Amino acid sequence: MIQAKTHVFWFVTGSQHLYGEEAVQEVEEHSKMICNGLNDGDLRFQVEYKAVATSLDGVRKLFEEANRDEECAGIITWMHTFSPAKMWIPGLSELNKPLLHFHTQFNRDIPWDKIDMDFMNINQSAHGDREYGFIGARLGIPRKVIAGYWEDREVKRSIDKWMSAAVAYIESRHIKVARFGDNMRNVAVTEGDKIEAQIQLGWSVDGYGIGDLVTEINAVSEQSLSELISEYEELYEWPEGEAARESVKEQARIELGLKRFLSSGGYTAFTTTFEDLHGMKQLPGLAVQRLMAEGYGFGGEGDWKTAALVRMMKMMAGGKETSFMEDYTYHFEPGNEMILGSHMLEVCPSIAEHKPRIEVHPLSMGAKDDPARLVFDGIAGPAVNVSLIDLGGRFRLVINKVEAVKVPHDMPNLPVARVLWKPQPSLRTSAEAWILAGGAHHTCLSYQLTAEQMLDWAEMSGIEAVLINRDTTILNLRNELKWSEAAYRLRKF
């Protein structure tokens, strides 16, 4: 796997000195207990108690420090007492890290027989957080609000999912995509504004001639090749015959060459295209699948937006059950409508139901030798299918909630990995909505991530998001698209 960096989240509690020093000390004690309680759960990332904020200068200095700290992936704020929101304006205005407004309180229950005004003055989250929430709305800053008791399991799960989105946002600002060759000729949706992508999303996209990659492939040693083949033999079912073995060996050579090229340039995502293979013996298939399983992003036919999207979603998902995907063909059986997703070769084995098998079959596109690839059925379960498109003036993230199902029949003549799913709210409505929103045929499919996480990432990134789920109707979606168009046009003025 690509080595992940260490990230923490700062916990900052709002208060004021109006209630006296003892009250501030009590707020600090309670804040530390909440942090310890959050860290006792199943959070992927550590919550670090930072301070009780009681002044404008204190907030500003703290947020400036957070901006500079490379390990800080975001700030969690909570108002234990009333905290006048004017003191938060400079800090919030300068903050460039993800922000979670955690609306909770230290005590779960009202102490009916003991409650007095001292208790009321300390435990004012119910209206202290409303004051703080107003200034967030007034400033128009992107933020997440999670309400609930801090020991509640569902609340912790919501915080954990937001943390994953925040870390993906921070890390995705440094994604570098290597493009081998150009886009597939005459295809529209895989094009896009690379400058705007770097400005808006932080993604850097570089193009290379295929000869640069071929040089690395040809430099692979026989020893490293032999070691990788041994790994293949342990992980996958193997084809019979010497010709098939030679095809697999060539994919291993491509994998090693690709990985060395990407590692040396600091690239964590890449694209290929069957129209640019001069000097290569095969279109990368098994090699791409293996690299995706290690956390690399990939896009077919030069689709750099999807390559970066896959990398970002891989980071958000911790590398689990996430893959490059394409809507391929429909099953229109009444009452059982489904979509079969696949691609020519490149589906990540992280979504495989069983042990993948290596197969070698002809591929008409590319006019090269028969490429080896992993073939498997995808797992069943809830998932999201996500596409990123460039509308010329802005990016739009299109999200569809789906339910992947077990493939009901053998497909012995289909030589590629495949996934079968039922889109929400139905195939007919989801397809109409997807097409109206301009969603691409290339997507990233993830079983680990939720639509809410993708919406959170879009909010952090400042891009439009369209969600297609059980509540979607075409009339409402048409109106939403019109409102979004108007809103983004107004942003330019």
Swiss-Prot record:
Pathway: Carbohydrate degradation; L-arabinose degradation via L-ribulose; D-xylulose 5-phosphate from L-arabinose (bacterial route): step 1/3. Its cofactor is Mn(2+). The keyword Transmembrane helix does not apply. Coiled coil: none annotated. InterPro entries: Ara_Isoase_C, AraA_central, AraA_N, AraA_N_sf, Fuc/Ara_isomerase_C, Fucose_isomerase_N/cen_sf, Lara_isomerase. GO terms for biological process: L-arabinose catabolic process to xylulose 5-phosphate. It comes from the Bacteria. GO terms for molecular function: L-arabinose isomerase activity; manganese ion binding. Catalyzes the conversion of L-arabinose to L-ribulose. This is L-arabinose isomerase 1.
